[in-house]
């Protein structure tokens, strides 16, 4: 199995509800290691840049407004098949469709405020990690 890195965001709704520790526990219990983490409050420009691929979609303005509404946690996770493992832990984008025991089923209220984001591919993960972290900020875990 391949050791991969993926990118994760705990969104403003979950941060506001003090779910950071519970969500980190889910990552670690699933065998994913947190190799970089920080809290940030995105500016409008940062949010628009991160979600640029959605700029022509009708929900873009609401997405940017939500993602700038409060602090977020951004983290880089590492582990076997990390991209898929992380997405499995998150559950379906719509929490109403998410399997019981997944992050979105347990911590999200709606499809618009769905608690977390996860990279959808290794290529996306590389781009998203680089958007928030320099190479020096990544701390591969050797123990």
Curated annotation (Swiss-Prot):
Domain of life, per UniProt, equals Bacteria
Output the CDD domains linked to this UniProt entry. NDPk_I
Q: Give the chief site where it resides.
A: cytoplasm
GO cellular component, alphabetical, reads:
cytoplasm
The residues annotated as the active site are: 117
Signal peptide positions on this chain: none
What EC number(s) has UniProt assigned to this enzyme? Answer: 2.7.4.6
| SMART domains tied to this protein | NDK
Which cofactor does the UniProt annotation name?
A: Mg(2+)
Query: Per UniProt, what is one GO molecular function of this protein?
Result: ATP binding
**Coiled-coil regions listed in the entry:** none
Keywords in UniProt for this one?
ATP-binding, Cytoplasm, Kinase, Magnesium, Metal-binding, Nucleotide metabolism, Nucleotide-binding, Phosphoprotein, Transferase
Q: Which reaction does it catalyse?
A: a 2'-deoxyribonucleoside 5'-diphosphate + ATP = a 2'-deoxyribonucleoside 5'-triphosphate + ADP; a ribonucleoside 5'-diphosphate + ATP = a ribonucleoside 5'-triphosphate + ADP
List locations, semicolon-separated: Cytoplasm
Q: Which GO terms describe its biological process?
A: CTP biosynthetic process; GTP biosynthetic process; UTP biosynthetic process
Residues involved in ATP binding = 11, 59, 87, 93, 104, 114
Entries under Pfam families matching the protein = NDK
PANTHER family per the UniProt record, alphabetical:
NUCLEOSIDE DIPHOSPHATE KINASE (PTHR46161), NUCLEOSIDE DIPHOSPHATE KINASE DDB_G0292928-RELATED (PTHR46161:SF3)
- Family named by the database record: Belongs to the NDK family.
Instruction: Kindly state the subunit structure of this protein.
Output: Homotetramer.
Q: What does this protein do?
A: Major role in the synthesis of nucleoside triphosphates other than ATP. The ATP gamma phosphate is transferred to the NDP beta phosphate via a ping-pong mechanism, using a phosphorylated active-site intermediate.
Q: What is this protein called?
A: Nucleoside diphosphate kinase
Gene transcribed to yield this protein: ndk
């Amino acid at each position: 199995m391949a050791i991969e890195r993926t990118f994760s965001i705990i969104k403003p709704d979950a941060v506001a509800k003090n779910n950071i520790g519970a969500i980190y526990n889910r990552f670690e219990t699933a065998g994913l290691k947190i190799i970089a983490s920080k809290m940030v409050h995105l500016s409008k420009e940062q949010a628009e840049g991160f979600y640029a691929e959605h700029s022509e979609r009708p929900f873009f303005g609401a997405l940017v407004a939500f993602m700038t509404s409060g602090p977020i946690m951004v983290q880089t996770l590492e582990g076997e098949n990390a991209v898929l493992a992380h997405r499995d832990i998150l559950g379906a984008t719509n929490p109403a469709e998410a399997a019981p025991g997944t992050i979105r089923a347990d911590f999200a209220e709606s499809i618009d405020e769905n608690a977390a984001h996860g990279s959808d591919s290794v290529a996306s993960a590389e781009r998203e990690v680089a958007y928030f972290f320099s190479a020096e900020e990544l701390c591969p875990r050797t123990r």
